[in-house]
Amino acid sequence: MKRIVLLRHGESLWNKENRFTGWTDVDLSEKGVEEACKAGDALREAGFSFEAAYTSYLKRAVKTLNCVLDRLDKDWIPVEKTWRLNEKHYGMLQGLNKSETAVQYGEEQVHIWRRSYDVAPAPVGKDDPRNPGMDIRYAGVPDSELPRTESLKDTIGRVMPYWKCIIFPALMYKDSLLVVAHGNSLRGIIKHLKGISDTDISNLNLPTAVPYVFEFDDRLVLVKDYYLGNPEEIRKRAEAVAKQGMAKK
């Protein structure tokens, strides 16, 4: 049996403040660090051991991965970081409060920006500090590939080449891999693995720091997928994610 575990980072400071984060490099909150450690504990108690790990260029994912590997005593395994696993770029929405944005534009429009498949928010300008082209960490990435806004479709377009060429083929010679990334980059991978339609993907909300396990047979055919944890608690946390784009009553 082969396994890949997908893990969204722990709560970030902007998750706590209910702000659109995207490619903004926001740190974990105190709660987020605790969530990451608990995810590592849950994986250890369930007997998981990883041979390699993958994450984004953003510290909230990197630090979550470090917490998990520390709990597993696997700090030494190979780790690859890539911009392709970054969160969806939210364009001009980055930094705005989601509830306040829902008051201004309506909950339906915010839901479309957050969860639709092919609608992107307005892009940031070329000289805007939110443009990844202004960030030295992306100096090696062609400017034409760096987004100034993205839909989920756009996000999948940059995630999938890395998934298909790097991560998934690694299962041919490794048995267990860990991917720590972001809500939308992981939603794209899950959409691909489970064959979720462009319409139904809007209903998928990933809670922070809950391991999502995918098991494959020796032919790399998906045979089982499940969250690791208490189903009722996970359901409530996913519902809380869905409500982030609602106006405060």
Swiss-Prot record:
Catalytic activity: (2R)-2-phosphoglycerate = (2R)-3-phosphoglycerate
PROSITE patterns: PG_MUTASE (PS00175)
This protein's record includes keyword Isomerase: yes
Entry superkingdom: Bacteria
Bridged cysteine pairs (disulfide): none
Biological process (GO), any one: gluconeogenesis
Residue positions binding substrate: 8-15, 21-22, 60, 87-90, 98, 114-115, 183-184
Pathway participation: Carbohydrate degradation; glycolysis; pyruvate from D-glyceraldehyde 3-phosphate: step 3/5
Keywords: Gluconeogenesis, Glycolysis, Isomerase
EC number: 5.4.2.11
Active-site residues per Swiss-Prot or TrEMBL entry: 9, 87
InterPro entries: His_Pase_superF_clade-1, His_PPase_superfam, PG/BPGM_mutase_AS, Phosphogly_mut1
UniProt site positions, description: Transition state stabilizer: 182
GO-annotated molecular function: phosphoglycerate mutase activity
HAMAP family hit by this protein: PGAM_GpmA
Family affiliation: Belongs to the phosphoglycerate mutase family. BPG-dependent PGAM subfamily.
Function according to Swiss-Prot or TrEMBL: Catalyzes the interconversion of 2-phosphoglycerate and 3-phosphoglycerate.
Full protein name: 2,3-bisphosphoglycerate-dependent phosphoglycerate mutase 1
Originating organism: Bacteroides thetaiotaomicron (strain ATCC 29148 / DSM 2079 / JCM 5827 / CCUG 10774 / NCTC 10582 / VPI-5482 / E50)
